[in-house]
């Protein structure tokens, strides 16, 4: 499964001129901890709820927080496990997806990643998972 197949188009994106207050409201509304910031369809980074709460004034534009942007994105043609890895590595609640030109395609949420990971591991199948540990010599026939 490719990352482009998991894009969630319901999560909004921020622009540089959006206010900290607007960003915090969106984070609260969508129950996530990060939002993507985009300018002219180019992905600039993720801004975290923590960095927004640390801002001096909630009337400030997101633009003044650029030094806090997290550069975590995956390519649209990558395997979905790269998105899982990015989410773990950067500790984000969403993973931005970009195309080859760096244009923002959308985000994958942790919920969508967890569902895909469960399907990938066979968690939705009836039965159990058996792990066998054998010495290498027993592999031969």
Where are the predicted features?
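A short beta-loop-alpha structural element at the N-terminal edge
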Residues: 14-17, 75
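Core beta-strand residues in small-molecule sensory/regulatory alpha/beta domains
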Residues: 38, 98-99
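Short, basic/aromatic recognition patches
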Residues: 17-25, 79-84
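A positional/architectural concept
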Residues: 30-33, 42-44
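Tandem CBS (Bateman) regulatory domains
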Residues: 1-10, 46-92, 100, 104-141
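Short, small/polar residue-rich loop motifs at catalytic or cofactor-binding pockets
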Residues: 29-32, 90-92
């Amino acid at each position: 499964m490719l990352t482009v197949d998991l894009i969630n188009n319901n999560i909004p994106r921020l622009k540089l001129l959006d206010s900290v207050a607007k960003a915090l409201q969106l984070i609260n509304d969508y129950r996530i901890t990060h939002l993507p910031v985009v300018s002219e369809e180019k992905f600039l980074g993720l801004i975290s709820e923590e960095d927004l709460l640390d801002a001096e004034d909630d009337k400030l534009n997101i633009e003044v927080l650029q030094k806090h942007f997290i550069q975590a994105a995956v390519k649209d043609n990558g395997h979905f496990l790269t998105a899982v890895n990015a989410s773990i590595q950067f500790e984000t609640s969403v993973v931005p997806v970009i195309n080859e030109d760096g244009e923002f395609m959308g985000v994958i949420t942790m919920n969508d990643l967890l569902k895909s990971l469960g399907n990938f591991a066979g968690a939705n199948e009836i039965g159990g998972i058996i792990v066998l540990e054998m010495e290498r010599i027993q592999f031969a026939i």
